[in-house]
Design a protein with these regions (language model features):
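C-terminal alpha-helical "lid/dimerization" subdomain adjacent to the S-adenosyl-L-methionine
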Residues: 7, 11, 28-30, 146-204
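Core SAM-dependent methyltransferase catalytic element
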Residues: 188-189, 193-232, 236-240
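N-terminal, positively charged/glycine-rich alpha-helical extensions of SAM-dependent methyltransferases
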Residues: 1-20
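Class I SAM-dependent methyltransferase SAM/SAH-binding core
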Residues: 51, 55-105
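A short acidic, Gly/Pro-enriched loop at the edge of an enzyme's catalytic core
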Residues: 104-115
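Conserved alpha-helix/loop element of class I SAM-dependent methyltransferases that forms part
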Residues: 30-48
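A short SAM/SAH-binding and catalytic strip from SAM-dependent methyltransferases
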Residues: 115-127
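A short glycine-rich, Lys/Arg-flanked "PGG" loop and its adjoining helix->strand segment in the class I
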Residues: 129-141
Length: 240
């Protein structure tokens, strides 16, 4: 990871989400609801095995279609306890397992899942580039990797505020300054769609398709994202 980015370690992440676990559903969980619903709606049109990285308290689990087999992982045991309670209470038989696991070292074989989703995760993990490569690794050819995340702005009031928050990453549990270029590193993942999400474009969905041998030119995807960030446009397919 570049030394230009504030670094959070795994211990800091665990500690932050130990504090968040009791109140997460009623705080950030509400803010993130629109993005979560949008991602799951897309996933429900697909088939097969789904891996949710950073499943947290399991807010998304009841929304997955019963035709899908869902596995969730998270670094926080306290968050996973909340997720397991939801699975038991709602009798979610399509949830195959919930595991305490580091997203940068997934304990699954290559090409194990048809869809891999990480919602509000990449700004939390200590090494997002390593996590991105793990998402690519466990996704099957033709499968999709879906991110919902906050990406920072370089200019304006929001950009100023994000830069002021940057030194407090360990305390708040996430990177306020996070450039989209950090997830555009996998040559076999073609960026197929970008969608700004509520509230007011604070979050963005990126949908990738795994196409081994495609050798995506990262600069093309970066140019597309730069255009979208400037214009604040709605859903757009990314030209391949």
């Amino acid at each position: 990871m570049s030394s230009n980015h504030p670094v959070m370690d795994t211990k800091s992440v665990r500690h932050a989400y130990r504090r968040w676990a009791p109140v997460y559903d009623y705080t950030f969980g509400q803010v993130a609801d629109a993005g979560r619903k949008h991602a799951v709606k897309i996933i429900n049109k697909r088939k097969g095995r789904v891996l949710e990285v950073g499943v947290g308290t399991g807010l998304s689990l009841p929304a997955y279609g019963k035709h899908l087999t869902v596995t969730g992982i998270d670094l926080s045991p306290e968050m996973l306890d909340k997720a397991r309670e939801k699975v038991a209470k709602k009798k979610l038989g399509n949830v195959d397992g919930l595991h305490e696991m580091d997203a940068s070292a997934l304990g699954f074989a290559d090409e194990s899942f048809d869809t891999v989703v990480a919602m509000y995760v990449m700004t939390v993990v200590p090494d997002p580039e390593k996590v991105m490569r793990e998402l690519e690794r466990v996704c099957a050819p033709g499968g999709e990797v879906i991110l919902v995340n906050h990406f920072s702005q370089e200019h304006g009031a929001r950009g100023f505020f994000e830069r002021k928050l940057a030194p407090f990453a360990d305390l708040i549990g996430w990177h306020a300054v996070f450039e989209p270029e950090r997830v555009l590193i996998c040559e076999d993942l073609r960026l197929a769609e970008r969608r700004p999400l509520w509230p007011v474009g604070l979050f963005t969905m990126l949908r990738f398709v795994k196409e081994p041998g495609f050798k995506v030119a990262p600069q093309a995807a970066r140019d597309f994202l730069a255009k979208g960030r400037k214009a604040g446009s709605a859903t757009e397919p990314v030209p391949s």
